[in-house]
C-alpha cells in the first residue's frame, strides 16, 4: 500500500519472487536496497510489514532513510504525516534489524577466500583497505581490511582469506592460491 502511495509499480510479492529467482540463479548474488520509513500515511502495521519483509529477504546491504517533506512534491501535502519521533523509532528499528542481518551475513564469509582490490593503506591499523565484488563504493557497503606481511600495490587484486567480521566490514589476510 505504501509503495502504491509512492507511485511505485512493484509489489511486495513481485519483489519476493524476483529476489528468490536471483538467489536461485546466482547463489552468490548480493542483494542491496534502500528503504524509506515514515512516508505520509504509513501505519505501524505497514511499517511492521516492511520490517518483516526485510527479516525474510535478509538483504546483504540496506540503507534506510526517514521521509522528509520537500516542497513541490506530491507527498509534501499528503495527510497523515508521520511524527518525527515515530520516524526515528522506525529508522532505529530497521537499522538494528539490519545490523544483526549484516553481522550474520558477514560471519558466513569467515574462512572463505575473496578476490580483493586494494584501494589504500590504513596507517592507523597498518591494514590495507579494499573491496570485493560484494562491496560497492558507496555509503551503504563496508570494506575488507587486509593484513599482509608484504607491501601491496594500490589497485592490485589479492586473494584474501576472511578471518572475522563486524556489522559492515570483513577482516582477513593475504593468501597465495
Language-model features: locations:
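Conserved non-cysteine loop/helix-boundary elements of the Radical SAM core domain that shape
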Residues: 1-61, 67-86
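Terminal RNA-binding accessory module
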Residues: 77-177
Amino acid at each position: 500500500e505504501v509503495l502504491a502511495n509512492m507511485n511505485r509499480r512493484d509489489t511486495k510479492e513481485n519483489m519476493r519472487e524476483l529476489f528468490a529467482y536471483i538467489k536461485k540463479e546466482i547463489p552468490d548474488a548480493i542483494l542491496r536496497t534502500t528503504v524509506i520509513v515514515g512516508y505520509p500515511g504509513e501505519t505501524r502495521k505497514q511499517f511492521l510489514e516492511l520490517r518483516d519483509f526485510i527479516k525474510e529477504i535478509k538483504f546483504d546491504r540496506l540503507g534506510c532513510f526517514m521521509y522528509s517533506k520537500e516542497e513541490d512534491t506530491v507527498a509534501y501535502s499528503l495527510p497523515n504525516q508521520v511524527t518525527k519521533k515515530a520516524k526515528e523509532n522506525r529508522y532505529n528499528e530497521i537499522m538494528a534489524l539490519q545490523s544483526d542481518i549484516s553481522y550474520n551475513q558477514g560471519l558466513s564469509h569467515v574462512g572463505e577466500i575473496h578476490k580483493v582490490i586494494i584501494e589504500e593503506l590504513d596507517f592507523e591499523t597498518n591494514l590495507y583497505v579494499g573491496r570485493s565484488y560484494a562491496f560497492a563504493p558507496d555509503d551503504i557497503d563496508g570494506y575488507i581490511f587486509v593484513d599482509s606481511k608484504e607491501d601491496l600495490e594500490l589497485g592490485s587484486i589479492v586473494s584474501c582469506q576472511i578471518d572475522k567480521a563486524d556489522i559492515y566490514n570483513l577482516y582477513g589476510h593475504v593468501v597465495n592460491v
